[in-house]
Amino acid sequence: MKKISYFLPLLMTLIVIFSCNKALHLPTGSTPVKFTNTTYDSLATYDMLGKPSNLVMPRDSISPSLTSFIFDKLPKAADNFKAHPELFTSTSNATLNFTQKTDITITFVQETALYLSTVGFYTFQTNNPPTNPNQITNIKYIFPNCSALNSGGELVPGDKVDIGTYLPGTSMGFVLMENSYKPATHSIYTNGNHFCSADILNPENDPSIRRHVVILDYPTINPTLSLISFEDTDRSNPTNDNDFDDVTIYATQKVVN
């Protein structure tokens, strides 16, 4: 009996060690990414439902052709990760890269997200993209609550914000902070999931499913219009639909002299 009592704990220990080692080689689930070196700024004040006070008027008119372009590229509730693999290659762009001095406005298009999430941006030198969250020193909120009217927020299609002028050699990444807006306290929770343009900053353990941001260039010349669309939940979750149209905005890029 003594031999059995010594043997069982040893067996259990070996099973645990084997399981842990095996788990290290299986990229399942996700690991929280902490942005401990990041400061957060709002471009303007915002009301209790997270609508910013710096909306530019008149708002943009969302044309039927633009709406059709979005739905053709990213149909709702479809697995667009499988349907459009060309959008998710390692070389497909999820950032804006400025080669000339450029004015940027960001326009809200639509939202069908599960939560009240915040959309913001960060900048970096094009030749030095971020490789870890400590390199994201500042995130600026564009839409503190990027939720539509009658969907937990007050945004309507065409609402837009001027986010400034950027110089050549600068790049801009976007971030959706999942379930971050708290209307009861008029605050933004910064310790939850950040889904960023840079795949390496996202929480999924499997690198092949870390993409959360898709940028599509709409056929215009100057100003250039780039659609930015988000997948708003952890993609390692089996309930995730991979449609990448939970929140859609666009950036209008106007080259200035």
Language model: regions and residue ranges:
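Low-complexity, intrinsically disordered short peptide segments enriched in small/polar/basic residues
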Residues: 1, 12-14
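Extracellular distal adhesion/interaction modules in secreted or cell-surface proteins
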Residues: 24-248, 254-255
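Sec-dependent N-terminal signal peptides
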Residues: 6-12
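Positively charged n-region of N-terminal signal peptides that target proteins for export
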Residues: 1-6, 21
